[in-house]
C-alpha cells in the first residue's frame, strides 16, 4: 500500500513567545518493509535555524531554533510512504519466550534497533510488579513468542477501555493500568512493560494508522491522528514484529512506522523548551490517504 500523509500542527500563544528550541520527530525513520519519498517540512514563521539528523534510536529528529517573538507557529510535515509485506501470523515453529530472552542477552549488536536497548526499564516504562502479576502465566517461558504476544495484545484490547481525553502524554503507566482505561499510548506502555518483565526486548512505536470513514460517509479532512503500538524482537529469524494492543492485532500494511524508542519520551512528535508565550493552544490536523483514493493518483 502507498499512502500520502500530511501532519499539520498550529500552536497559538496568549502572549509573544520570545525564544524556543523544539525537537520534531515527524519524518519516518528507515524501517524494513517500508519506504518514504517526497518528504517536506514547512515551518511558519521560518526558524532562525533548523538541523535534521537521525537520532539515537530508529528516529529522525529535526531541531528548530526560534529567536524572534511570535504568537503562532505552524508546522506541516508531508510525505509519500509505501508499506510492503504480507500478513504476519503465529507459526508452529516460532521460538519460545525463554529462548528469545536468552538470545537477546547473547546479541552483540548495539545499533539503534539492537534488542539490548529495549530489555530494561525506562523513564516512561518502569517495570511494575502489578503488571507482572496481572499477566500471570500469559508470558511463561515455554510459550511460543508470537502467539503469546498476540494473546497479550488482545487481552489489553478486551480489558482496557479506549477513552480519548482520559489521559495525556504525562500520565504514568501505573495510573493508566490501575484505571484500566486510556489511549493508544497508555496501552502500548502497558504492553512494553509486560514484555520486558518477561525478559523480552520490547519497543514503543509512534506512527500513523489507516482509518476508514463510516459507510456512505466521506473522508473527513484532517480527522486522522498519530497512533502508538509495540515492536517485539522475536529472535533473529523472525526479527521485530509489531503488535497493536489498542486494536488487538499484529500490525499490517495499515500501520505506518515513523519512529521507535524505549518509550514515548524517545519518539514524541514534538517537544522542547520555550520562553514567554503564556497560555497556549494546540490545533492538530492529520490526513492518511491511500494513493488510490487521491484524484489523479501519484
Give a label for each model feature.
Residues 1, 7, 20-22, 39, ...:
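Structural beta-strand/beta-sheet cores of well-ordered domains, especially the beta-sheet scaffolds
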Residues 1-106:
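Intrinsically disordered, low-complexity N-terminal segments that are enriched in acidic
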Residues 9, 167, 246:
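Ser/Thr-centric signal marking residues that sit
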Residues 13, 158, 168-169, 173, ...:
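Glycine-rich, flexible loop/turn motifs
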Residues 25-34, 39-41, 247-281, 288-290, ...:
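Glycine-rich, small/acidic residue-mixed loop/short-helix segments
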Residues 96-182, 198, 262-264, 279, ...:
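Secondary-structure boundary elements
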Residues 154, 186-278:
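Hydrophobic/aromatic-rich core segments of domains that either
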Amino acid at each position: 500500500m502507498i499512502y500520502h500523509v500530511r501532519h499539520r500542527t498550529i500552536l497559538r500563544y496568549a502572549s509573544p513567545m520570545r525564544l524556543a528550541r523544539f525537537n520534531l520527530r515527524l519524518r519516518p525513520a528507515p524501517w524494513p518493509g517500508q519506504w518514504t519519498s517526497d518528504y517536506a517540512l514547512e515551518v511558519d514563521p521560518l526558524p532562525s535555524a533548523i538541523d535534521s539528523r537521525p537520532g539515537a534510536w530508529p528516529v529522525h529528529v529535526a531541531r528548530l531554533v526560534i529567536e524572534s517573538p511570535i504568537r503562532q507557529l505552524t508546522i506541516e510535515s508531508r510525505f509519500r510512504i509505501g508499506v510492503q509485506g504480507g500478513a504476519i501470523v503465529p507459526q508452529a515453529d516460532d521460538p519460545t519466550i525463554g529462548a528469545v530472552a536468552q538470545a537477546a542477552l547473547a546479541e552483540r549488536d548495539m545499533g539503534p534497533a539492537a534488542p539490548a536497548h529495549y530489555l530494561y526499564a525506562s523513564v516512561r516504562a518502569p517495570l511494575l510488579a502489578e503488571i507482572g502479576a496481572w499477566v500471570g502465566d500469559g508470558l511463561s517461558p515455554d510459550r511460543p513468542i508470537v502467539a503469546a504476544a498476540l494473546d497479550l495484545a488482545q487481552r489489553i484490547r478486551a480489558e482496557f477501555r479506549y477513552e480519548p481525553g482520559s489521559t495525556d502524554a504525562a500520565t504514568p503507566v501505573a495510573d493508566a493500568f490501575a484505571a484500566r482505561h486510556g489511549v493508544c499510548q497508555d496501552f502500548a506502555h502497558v504492553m512494553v512493560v509486560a514484555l520486558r518483565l518477561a525478559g523480552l526486548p520490547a519497543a514503543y512505536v509512534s506512527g500513523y494508522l489507516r482509518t476508514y470513514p463510516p459507510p456512505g460517509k466521506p473522508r473527513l479532512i484532517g480527522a486522522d491522528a498519530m497512533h502508538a503500538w509495540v515492536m517485539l524482537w522475536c529472535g533473529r529469524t523472525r526479527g521485530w514484529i509489531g503488535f497493536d494492543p489498542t486494536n488487538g492485532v499484529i500490525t499490517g500494511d495499515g500501520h505506518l512506522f515513523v519512529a521507535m524508542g524505549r518509550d514515548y519520551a524517545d519518539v514524541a512528535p514534538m517537544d522542547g523548551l520555550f520562553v514567554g508565550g503564556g497560555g497556549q493552544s494546540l490545533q492538530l490536523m492529520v490526513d492518511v490517504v491511500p494513493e488510490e483514493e487521491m484524484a489523479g493518483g501519484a
